[in-house]
Amino acid sequence: MENKIAPFSYSGSSAGNSSSGGVVSSSLYSDQLYKSTRNIMQQRQDMVNREALCYTRLHEASLEAEALRLENTELRSMNLRLKNELNSLIRSSIQNRFDHRSPLRMLSNLSIGGNDADEVENQNRTVNRDDVNDKSPTSVMENEDLNRSSLPKSISVRSNGYSKASQGGGGAAAQSGKPRGTVTKPGTCGQVSTTQKVYVRGGGKKEDQEEEIEVEVYNQGMTKTELCNKWQETGTCPYGDHCQFAHGIKELRPVIRHPRYKTEVCRMVLAGDNCPYGHRCHFRHSLSEQEKLVAAGFKPKSSLKLIT
């Protein structure tokens, strides 16, 4: 009978051990499940935090973009306002420039030595000097605020009397028999300084409204017939009143010129070279559109180099 009980007790002991092992396995599984669940929740919380941070940064970026947009709009409006002010300033400056030059309208038919213009020849008539007074035509120019850099180097008057003045060395003065102030200027190659009177057309727009203006003209090279370079550059001259050149438009005397003065283009300029005579050249330096095409057809002169 003992042999039958012993196996029973052994089997019972085995059953107890099996039950104990099952409890241990269940607790381990619960711990692992808890840890994995906790890790998953931690990862989810991290994702939520990162998403919130992204939303925060996106909101800040949108606010910064809006601020930049407002600043850009303000800069555009400021730029437009400055542009309008600049345009108004330019218009007023141009208007003032035209207003300052209004006293010079009487010389619209004259050829300005510093500015080459393709104008129609003036049909001027020479008259006897005894029938007119000695008042200079430049006395009507009352404006002293002109920019020195924009003043002409000389005032040229085309006249048929130029040929008469060049013949006989006296022109109208020799014909009238009363030479006036024939003074030889030093450094002008002994040129005789004579004056005569000519008529030029005024600045009227219509031919019937044009009034002839009496102008006293001088020969080239006489005193005060060209603007002083030193005065034009700095506004002062070391020679002062003893300077032989003009210090302003009021002192500038008109110079009588040949009727074809400044009517033909300078060949050196047309060939693309620099004219050594500058504003003293008797030919035009400004080119028309057709002359520019002709000048473009000239091939530039290649400099010849001597090879030794």
From Swiss-Prot:
Highest taxon of the lineage: Eukaryota
Subcellular locations according to the entry: Cytoplasm; Nucleus
Name of the protein in its database record: Zinc finger CCCH domain-containing protein 15
PROSITE patterns per record: ZF_C3H1
SMART domains: ZnF_C3H1
Any one GO biological process: brassinosteroid mediated signaling pathway
Region described as Disordered: spans on this chain: 1-21, 110-190
InterPro entries membership: ZFP36-like (IPR045877), Znf_CCCH (IPR000571), Znf_CCCH_sf (IPR036855)
Keywords (A to Z) from UniProt: Brassinosteroid signaling pathway, Coiled coil, Cytoplasm, DNA-binding, Metal-binding, Nucleus, Phosphoprotein, Repeat, Transcription, Transcription regulation, Zinc, Zinc-finger
Organism (species): Arabidopsis thaliana
